Amino acid sequence: PLAMPLASLLWVSVLLGQPQPQPLCTTAEVFLRDDRRMAAIVEPDTVDDWRTRKRVAGCRVTAAGGTTRGVQAEAVGFYERVRAVGWVRTPEPRDAPSEGSLRFRSGPADCLFNVYGAAMLNTDAEMLAEDRRPLVAGETRYHVYVMCLPVMPAAPRDSTPPRPR
């Protein structure tokens, strides 16, 4: 009689130890792996959402790739390609274009993409992505970090408090 509950508990512990699918990040992950030929690591995430002023369950993708044209040119080409494959800018995107971050929408997800050069997050995911995508001769390392949240309407223009000066 005790064997069945114990077996069930063991099965649950195995399932909990497995990476869980992150459907909000699926399109971004596939794009990074298949189109951009990057190694991509997907993880669950909780993000402070400016639209709702709440913590929202989402996911993140940490990817590593190589470029022969330099990181800045790669970033420009990257965002052109994001648009070409069907991602659209989110309504009233609040992103950081001077920092290389742009927010796009595809299907059920609003995702903030950030393109950068050398490793700077110092996370296990960043190191694992680099290990999975070695550079070949003539390539320079670049990374993409993506945070995805469920699609939501844009916040009213007066809903965000002004930034302190």
Language model segments and positions:
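An acidic-aromatic pocket/loop used at catalytic or ligand-binding sites
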Residues: 16-165
